[in-house]
Amino acid sequence: MEKRMKLRVSRIVRSSLSSCRPRDLYDVVETCAVTSKATSSERFFVTKAKTKTPSRPKSHASSCPRASPIFPPNPFYEESRSFRDLRKKVKTNRKQRSQFGSDPLFASRFKSTGSWYWSCSEEEDEGDKEESEDDDSDTLFSSRSFSSDSSKAESFAVVKKSKDPYEDFRTSMVEMIVERQIFAPAELQQLLQCFLSLNSRQHHKVIVQVFLEIYATLFSP
């Protein structure tokens, strides 16, 4: 029994030693060559596979439009606008002043010496030099009636030298409101635009101030 055990142990030791012995140079070189071929083929396959991968066209990348935020309009914007903002947006183009006579709000024709009149002075188109020399010249509305019936009354604009533009504009605006029975907010705003269009910019501040005071008086609780 002991001899058999020794033989088995010796065989196990020999097999382990034989596995640990160095291999021949030929085997090592052949194994490395096979390994290098395998790795090179794998690398070539990977590289080839990458080149064959189809790229996504750029035209489809941005085909979907970007989502933009949509803000609902404010329905109370028009009602909440102050008259100061309205004054800034009033156009002062003198070429449009001739259209004032055909305004449906004021059915009567505003006349001055038998012709359409919409400037502060007859030489206004020559430049602003005359305005600087004649700063106290204002175009005011006069509600003088040629008939007792207000619906048939005719009014005209007058040019006058004024030392107190505030009082003159206030008197003229009140006369127009009473004569034409202008009490609706929309009609009052249109009246303000008419005053601004007929007068130079240097008087717009006074006109708006007078209008705001009259408007507050009419609609005060």
Curated annotation (Swiss-Prot):
Chief location category: nucleus
Keyword Thylakoid in record: no
Q: Which GO terms describe its cellular component?
A: nucleus
Q: What happens when the gene is disrupted?
A: No visible phenotype under normal growth conditions.
Q: Which residues form the OVATE domain?
A: 158-217
Keyword Transcription recorded: yes
The subcellular localization recorded is: Nucleus
Q: What ranges does the record give for the region Disordered, renumbered to this chain?
A: 124-147
Q: Which UniProt keywords apply?
A: Nucleus, Repressor, Transcription, Transcription regulation
Q: Where is the composition biased (Acidic residues)?
A: 124-138
* Any one of the GO BP annotations: negative regulation of DNA-templated transcription
What is the tissue localization of expression for this protein? Expressed in roots, rosette and cauline leaves, shoots, stems, flower buds and siliques.
UniProt xrefs under InterPro entries:
Ovate, Ovate_C
Q: What does this protein do?
A: Transcriptional repressor that regulates multiple aspects of plant growth and development through the regulation of BEL1-LIKE (BLH) and KNOX TALE (KNAT) homeodomain transcription factors.
User: Additional info?
Assistant: Plants over-expressing OFP8 show flat, thick and cyan leaves, and enhanced apical dormancy.
Write down the NCBIfam families for this protein, in alphabetical order: A_thal_3678 (TIGR01568)
Q: State the protein's name.
A: Transcription repressor OFP8
Q: Which organism was this protein described from?
A: Arabidopsis thaliana (Mouse-ear cress)
